[in-house]
Curated annotation (Swiss-Prot):
Belongs to the UPF0303 family. Pfam families: HbpS-like. This is UPF0303 protein RHECIAT_CH0003058. Coiled coil: none annotated. It comes from the Bacteria. HAMAP family: UPF0303. SUPFAM superfamilies: GlcG-like.
Length: 164
């Protein structure tokens, strides 16, 4: 797959993986689903669900370090800045030959790497972010997409990014 293929697929994901409504209970269910998927697969990941600026769900599974906590924050900042997945933002920067610093942002606070995805509500837009850190960035992204697809009863096979 090319960069453009990935960017197009992620745009499709961001459109399809939108909720009719999303509240604190839904946020908890999403976080718990990610925690269950990661636990079943023995994945050492940090999981965060944040609505607006309020943390709603957080889990650190065996293997997570304080560094992952910082990655979660930095990836989530990308979603809150651009209202799109951190992976899409990173791929777009790569395509354009730019860095976050070229956009006046600090790499200490913004990580254009896969793993954070906007929580979109139809008719409203981005109200939060769901973030995973601990795997290679494409795998972090795909894990979040899988959980969202399961919650929304969407066909994961048509949404998942192909392996590199």
């Amino acid at each position: 797959m090319t960069l453009d293929d990935d960017l197009n697929r992620i745009a499709e994901q961001e459109k399809e993986l939108s909720f009719d409504a999303f509240d604190l209970t839904t946020a908890w269910q999403l976080g718990k689903l990610l925690q269950e998927l990661a636990t079943e697969r023995c994945l050492g990941v940090a999981i965060d669900v944040t609505l607006h600026s309020m943390p709603v769900f957080y889990a650190a599974l065996p293997g997570v370090t304080p560094d992952n906590v910082n990655w979660v924050r930095r990836k989530r900042n990308m979603v809150f800045r651009y209202f799109r997945s951190s992976y899409a933002s990173g791929l777009k920067l790569k395509k354009d030959g730019k860095t976050v610093e070229d956009n006046g942002l600090s790499g200490d606070d913004y990580a254009p790497h896969g793993g954070s995805f906007p929580i979109n509500v139809k008719g409203t837009g981005c109200i939060g972010a769901v973030t995973v850190s601990g795997l290679p960035q494409r795998d972090d992204h795909n894990l979040v997409v899988e959980a969202l697809a399961l919650m929304l009863a969407k066909d994961l096979d048509t949404l998942r990014l192909a392996p590199l």
